[in-house]
A protein has these predicted regions:
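Thiamine diphosphate
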Residues: 1-128, 135, 143, 346-348, ...
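Generic long, charged, amphipathic alpha-helical segments
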Residues: 268-301
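Peripheral docking tails and interdomain loops at the edges
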Residues: 312-378
Length: 378
């Protein structure tokens, strides 16, 4: 047993290695940059691991798609602004059936926002960020060891579903340091293996050869250059059913705290850690697989409680999904501006349970003796 002080971002990288990842492409952006730095150092000492610091997030996203098509387990890491730029590539990977992993370490937005302050504003971007009709499988850990484990799950889910999978994190989880035994965790993990034919054997379709993942449809594959609704539907439902089946294997959540209380608090990521001192007063539902929504599981649990309160570091994105799942209104506590504290959680829950507004009072303008703090740069 080797217990070591480990950062959340480092745990993600080590989880990727445990899952068999051999390629990383990325562009530095706070608060995900440690993953890029660690990958760079690892590649320098392990030539079998390939590393690319690309010119931007668009290139990074497309690079991991190419690496995956060539047979590697590949991933990238970014934050909200970079993930916005990657959306076209995410959709392409979904369409072509490319297993790959995107890590989004969220910060306060929109746009540059506050690069060093935590936020959870990309919850719905993951679900509907790209064009088309699909929802990537997405995980959101709340600690270092869990970040390691869900990274392995993310790679396995990507391989099994042949689709991009997202790992969500935030500034606090990414920079959280905890003493954990990741070597012991790795022993209990099982990494999905990539099964490919021998490289170089040409298939019966022009311009295609075995040994890599390729989208063998369309005019480049010798098929008519016309749209066929029936064929599209066949491919779509084949991918959808595979996706649903795989997502069901990773229906991970936590239902705990005081399960006999009459109020259920729904929260995730770092907010669930901040709110933990309230465990004696409330029940907890914490989704770990954040997408697709754990609708059936949550609905069955929520029926046992008088009130459901959703606490999250955004303006109620997940609360919208919770209401759709349980078919009744919920109380909302939005933690905005990067301020995620036990006091804010406590005050917010008390306020909404007493019938008050979701939003706290707007802070006053700073006086001339208290200048406004700079927001920083990305």
């Amino acid at each position: 047993m080797t217990r070591k002080l480990t950062q959340g971002n480092e745990a993600v990288f080590r989880g990727a290695l445990a899952a068999g990842a051999s390629y990383y492409a990325g562009y530095p952006i706070s608060p995900s940059t440690e993953i890029l730095n660690i990958a760079s150092g690892w590649a320098a000492e392990h030539p079998e691991f390939r590393f690319l610091q690309a010119e931007d997030e668009i290139a990074s996203a497309n690079a991991i798609i190419g690496a995956s098509l060539a047979g590697a387990k590949a991933f990238t890491a970014t934050s909200g602004p970079g993930f916005s730029l990657m959306q076209e590539a995410v959709g392409y990977a979904q369409k072509v059936g490319v297993p790959c992993v995107f890590v989004n370490v969220m910060r306060v937005g929109p746009a540059t926002g506050m690069p060093t302050m935590p936020g959870q504003g990309d919850i719905m971007q993951v679900k509907w960020g790209s064009t088309g009709d699909y929802t990537p499988i997405a995980f959101y850990p709340n600690g270092v060891e869990e970040a390691f484990r869900v990274t392995i799950d993310a790679f396995n889910a990507a391989e099994e579903s042949r689709s991009p999978v997202v790992i969500l994190s935030d500034t606090f989880v990414a920079h959280l340091n905890e003493v954990v035994d990741l070597d012991e965790s790795a022993l209990s993990a099982t990494a999905a293996k990539r099964e490919l034919a021998p490289l170089g054997e040409f298939t019966d379709k022009p311009r295609f050869f075995a040994g890599v993942l390729m989208y063998e449809h369309g005019p480049n594959a010798g098929e008519p250059a016309t749209a066929d609704a029936d064929e599209y539907l066949r491919q779509y439902y084949e991918a959808k059913h595979r996706h649903v089946e795989v997502a069901a294997r990773y229906a991970q959540f936590e239902h705990g705290w005081n399960v006999d209380a009459d109020v259920l608090v729904v929260c995730y990521g770092i907010v669930s850690r901040v709110a933990a001192p309230l465990r004696d007063e409330f029940a907890l539902f914490r989704p770990i697989r954040i997408h697709p929504m754990l609708s059936d599981e949550l609905a069955a649990i929520a029926d046992r409680y008088r009130e459901v309160v959703v606490v999250e570091a955004n303006d109620g994105q997940y609360a919208d999904l919770v209401e759709l799942a349980i078919h009744r209104p919920v109380k909302r506590v939005p933690l905005l501006g990067g301020r995620i504290s036990l006091e804010a959680v406590r005050e917010g829950i008390d306020r909404v349970l007493a019938g008050g507004p979701s939003e706290p009072p707007i802070p006053p303008e700073p006086s001339e003796h208290q200048p406004r703090a700079p927001l920083g740069v990305g």
